[in-house]
């Protein structure tokens, strides 16, 4: 079988990261969570609001480590849990729309996929980061289901939230992601759309694995 890259795009809480991790594990590929990278930059900005974002980005050290599940390090510190907190979630779409931030991270992400064998999820993977990916998937789900998933995830992390609050946050993020000037969330022309509403993790994972095997 030939080595391939798999691009998985879609809106917030569509199940991209959960599915992408499982697909990568099943196919012995490398998983890259680009959303975590943007969240880490957002956290850095929240912690140093007085520093111009362009200067901040130039001096940030980001590392993804696949050890007991992927961990992300910001300037040497493990921020994998901190970047999932509500203040980061509220600000990540705004920070991700800044040109200098996207330029730095897209360059990093493209370097990661140069040797293939990568499953990468995000908002612009199939359209901007690796438009030449052998398999492109665009995952969607209803706003209600995505809010419920995020609610369960927050409970598991000990984060207080309500369904209505999360539904509003997701609708706001959808609008920001789809209307931003730089690399807006959009489906690549040759991407395969999968609606995960009402489907199990196992069902969607199996579907993408079969698509990947056909592309190898």
Swiss-Prot record:
Known catalytic reactions: CMP + ATP = CDP + ADP; dCMP + ATP = dCDP + ADP
CC per GO annotation: cytosol
UniProt KW Disulfide bond keyword: no
Name of the top EC class for this enzyme: transferase
Positions that bind ATP: 10-18
EC id: 2.7.4.25
GO biological process: nucleobase-containing small molecule interconversion; pyrimidine nucleotide metabolic process
Keywords on record: ATP-binding, Cytoplasm, Kinase, Nucleotide-binding, Transferase
Tagged with keyword Ligase: no
Family, as annotated: Belongs to the cytidylate kinase family. Type 1 subfamily.
Protein known as: Cytidylate kinase
Lineage: Bacteria, Bacillati, Bacillota, Bacilli, Bacillales
